[in-house]
């Protein structure tokens, strides 16, 4: 049977569990995650990031005390200008 060669990708995705016992150090290699596990991990991470962004956004809106339509309009226009400036620089 042919063994899979280690590539930078497989080396980076390999889980390694290291434990110290006595004076020596023992390294135990666990199975490489399969593609479904990797996709699941990526989706969970992206969902956590998305939730954090939404929470931060709501906190910003809630931090405004009694926002008026005019103050909201100014805030949106400032964000729009900043966004357009970033588009031009990229």
UniProtKB/Swiss-Prot annotation:
Pfam families: PB1-F2 (PF11986). This is Protein PB1-F2. GO terms for cellular component: host cell cytosol; host cell mitochondrial inner membrane; host cell nucleus; membrane. The record marks 66 as: Low pathogenicity. Oligomer. Interacts with human SLC25A6/ANT3 and VDAC1. Interacts with host MAVS. Its main location: host cell. Plays an important role in promoting lung pathology in both primary viral infection and secondary bacterial infection. Promotes alteration of mitochondrial morphology, dissipation of mitochondrial membrane potential, and cell death. Alternatively, inhibits the production of interferon in the infected cell at the level of host mitochondrial antiviral signaling MAVS. Its level of expression differs greatly depending on which cell type is infected, in a manner that is independent of the levels of expression of other viral proteins. Monocytic cells are more affected than epithelial cells. GO terms for biological process: symbiont-mediated perturbation of host apoptosis; symbiont-mediated suppression of host cytoplasmic pattern recognition receptor signaling pathway via inhibition of MAVS activity. Residues 1-34 are annotated as: Disordered. It comes from the Viruses. Belongs to the influenza viruses PB1-F2 family. It is found in: Host mitochondrion inner membrane; Host nucleus; Host cytoplasm, Host cytosol. The keyword Membrane applies. Residues 65-87 are annotated as: Mitochondrial targeting sequence. Keywords: Apoptosis, Host cytoplasm, Host membrane, Host mitochondrion, Host mitochondrion inner membrane, Host nucleus, Host-virus interaction, Inhibition of host innate immune response by virus, Inhibition of host MAVS by virus, Inhibition of host RLR pathway by virus, Membrane, Modulation of host cell apoptosis by virus, Viral immunoevasion. The keyword Secreted does not apply. Residues 1-15 have a biased composition (Polar residues). Is not encoded in all strains, and seems to be dispensable for replication.
């Amino acid at each position: 049977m042919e063994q899979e060669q280690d590539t930078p990708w497989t080396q980076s995705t390999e889980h390694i569990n290291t434990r110290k016992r006595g004076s020596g150090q023992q390294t135990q290699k666990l199975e490489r995650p399969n593609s479904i596990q990797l996709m699941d991990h990526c989706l969970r991470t992206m969902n956590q990031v998305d939730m954090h962004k939404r929470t931060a956004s709501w906190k910003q809106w809630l931090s405004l005390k009694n926002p008026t339509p005019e103050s909201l309009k100014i805030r949106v226009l400032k964000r729009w200008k900043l966004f357009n400036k970033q588009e031009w620089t990229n």
